[in-house]
């Protein structure tokens, strides 16, 4: 999969990836895709003790303020919750988009309102939205079988 990512996402070779990740390590999304992407490209992975659930999302927001990356790989619920916070917090919005190259979601559909809000905020903060992509994968075999953007 890392060869596929390198072919489809040349951004990864352009500069070392930096990612904040809460996803469970026993799952192919975090354990195979994200972790191996960081290793293959000499990047930095920051482990997030929060996640998109009540009582833990504030931890994710604090970590994001400190370690926003050039990659944001997550599930749609995370991005929906993040959009609500960024609508109220311009500093958080600036931190999230400041260095962001790629926004990736998987695990479910990203609703149109969240997609539109992320594009709009990206334009407001950097003049254009980051590359927004998704992937169809197979948990049993590999994290990605098809990538679309």
Predicted region positions:
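Conserved AMP-binding/adenylation subdomain of ANL enzymes
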Residues: 1-18, 25-90
């Amino acid at each position: 999969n890392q060869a596929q990512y390198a072919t489809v996402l040349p951004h990864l070779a352009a500069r070392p990836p930096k990612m904040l990740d809460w996803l469970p390590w026993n799952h192919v999304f975090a354990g195979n895709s994200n972790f191996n992407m960081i290793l293959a490209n000499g990047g930095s992975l920051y482990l997030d003790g929060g996640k998109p659930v009540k009582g833990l999302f504030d931890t994710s927001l604090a970590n994001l303020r400190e370690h926003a990356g050039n990659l944001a790989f997550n599930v749609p619920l995370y991005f929906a919750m993040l959009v609500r916070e960024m609508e109220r917090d311009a500093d958080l919005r600036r931190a999230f988009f400041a260095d962001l190259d790629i926004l990736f979601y998987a695990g479910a559909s990203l609703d149109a309102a969240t997609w539109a809000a992320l594009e709009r905020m990206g334009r407001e903060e950097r003049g254009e939205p980051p590359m927004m992509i998704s992937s169809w994968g197979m948990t049993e075999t590999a994290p990605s079988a098809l990538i679309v953007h």
